């Protein structure tokens, strides 16, 4: 999964709708916005382990939800934790987007979130290969 293209952020800030729509059609379904090393935080508490929190999403896709329910911005980007479990295996954990965004009771938002379910599942499967 690629890092979020910083030029896309500028495109959105500038209101370049044509370029944003092109990005929606041709760009990656999901990008990494930020990575936080929670394992380092655990090490401070004497519980060292591998644990990364990824914030991933697509700003254009997020806008398709927030235009109907601005409070959907509370949950975009999506957060995925990749951590080492007690027996040393890597585990992905996340809230399913359609469930999280479904709380708003707006079918337009939920429909976009179902697309995120599929994109997230594809991305995580690719990451395990």
List the predicted regions and their residue ranges.
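Short, low-complexity Ser/Thr-rich regulatory SLiMs
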Residues: 80-86
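Cytosolic covalent-transfer regions centered on His/Cys nucleophiles
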Residues: 1-75, 86-90, 97-129
